């Protein structure tokens, strides 16, 4: 395994442990595992989306973000991603963008909920819809155990970085 992959895995592991420790004080282990597992899976889907888009757009020399902002490209990449992946994560909802929001202290739980909703909505009417039904339902993002308000909840998750 190359060093960059090992470093990336170690960083992810450290962030997940930090998230677990931040949530541990507010809820039981069986409760916070739902958040951790949901975030791991969202990370996986986001990473897969980014790699897919890099490969899809490499010959066109355009970024995913730029392609998304061009209506013709957007229609084509949405169609391709839904056919090949069964879902699409919009550029603004990529996991790495959320990490930057956390670092900039602009992240909140409501944004994560919008990201998950957009992902789930992308599967509606596709063969993958049934596979995704209820996938993130155990992540109760409106739970007061994450904080009393959206911003406090976001602050609690900010501790993970």
PLM segments and residue spans:
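Non-catalytic, mostly N-terminal accessory regions of nucleic-acid modification and defense proteins
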Residues: 1-161
């Amino acid at each position: 395994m190359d060093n960059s992959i090992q470093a990336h895995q170690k960083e992810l592991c450290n962030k997940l442990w930090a998230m677990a420790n931040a949530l541990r004080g507010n809820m039981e282990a069986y409760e916070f595992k739902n958040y951790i597992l949901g975030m791991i899976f969202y990370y996986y889907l986001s990473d897969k989306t980014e790699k897919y888009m890099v490969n899809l757009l490499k010959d066109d020399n355009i970024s995913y973000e730029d392609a998304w902002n061009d209506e013709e490209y957007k229609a084509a990449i949405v169609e391709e991603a839904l056919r090949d992946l069964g879902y699409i994560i919009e550029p603004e909802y990529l996991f790495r963008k959320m990490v930057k929001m956390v670092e900039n202290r602009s992240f909140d739980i409501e944004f994560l909920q919008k990201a998950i909703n957009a992902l789930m909505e992308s599967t509606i009417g596709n063969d993958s819809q049934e596979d995704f039904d209820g996938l993130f339902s155990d992540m109760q993002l409106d739970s007061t155990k994450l904080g009393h308000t959206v911003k406090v909840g976001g602050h609690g998750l900010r501790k993970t970085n």
